[in-house]
Amino acid sequence: NVISGKDKALQKRIIEEGKDSKADLYITADAGRLGAFQAKGMFQRGASSKAIKAAVPSNFRTAYWTGIAKRARIIYYSPERVSASELKGMTYESLADPKWKGKVVIRKSNNVYNQSLVASLIKNNGKKATAEWAKGVVANMARDSKGNDRAQILAVAAGEADLAVANTYYLALMLSGKKGPEQQAAAKKVKPFFPNQDGRGTHMN
């Protein structure tokens, strides 16, 4: 049997059912969510079989959970207002550069996708540098944070911003036409850019 639902609702159900829970597998998006749920003691060790170790790189699994898919959190840009040469060597850290003042959009900081990105920045750059980076990004924002990842892409397409941070699959979803012709047309007005290619690489989750 498969029970689908919102992440928080499913976690609440598993916690309330406790030892009586019939759930064998819990599938959700983002390692941050998995880590938080693991910290509550809700997983059993067992995600370390030979088959899993052979199929999944060590950085995408623990003894308690394993990744089964991955996506990148990248930068989208307007090719009409930003040239490819301007993005050469672009990093997540570059989003705090004053040259992008009034040109960046990203969803709210309470979003788990952003929290995981920030966690990776803390891991690589330290808490102090990451805190300064966050202040720089806020100073560069074209508007107050609002909406989901697709809303950020739409903002770039509409000319409200030049750069947006969003996961890769949202662009594919928009281009497919499943979200309507307006979003499909908007998606064609932006281009994806994978940052940090000269260093640690793009953030994957």
Protein language model regions, located:
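Short beta-strand->loop
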Residues: 43-50, 61-68, 77-79, 84-85, 93, 98-125, 181-201, ...
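Early extracytoplasmic/lumenal segment of secretory-pathway proteins
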Residues: 1-35
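Beta->alpha turn/N-cap motifs
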Residues: 6-7, 27-32, 49-50, 148-149, ...
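Ligand-binding pocket segment of bilobal, Venus flytrap-like solute-binding proteins
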Residues: 109, 113-116, 120-195
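Periplasmic solute-binding protein
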Residues: 31-42, 60-87, 119, 202-205
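A structural signal for short loop-to-beta-strand junctions that line the ligand-binding cleft
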Residues: 21-26, 44-77, 93, 103-106
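Alpha-to-beta junction loops
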Residues: 17-26, 42, 100-102, 158-166
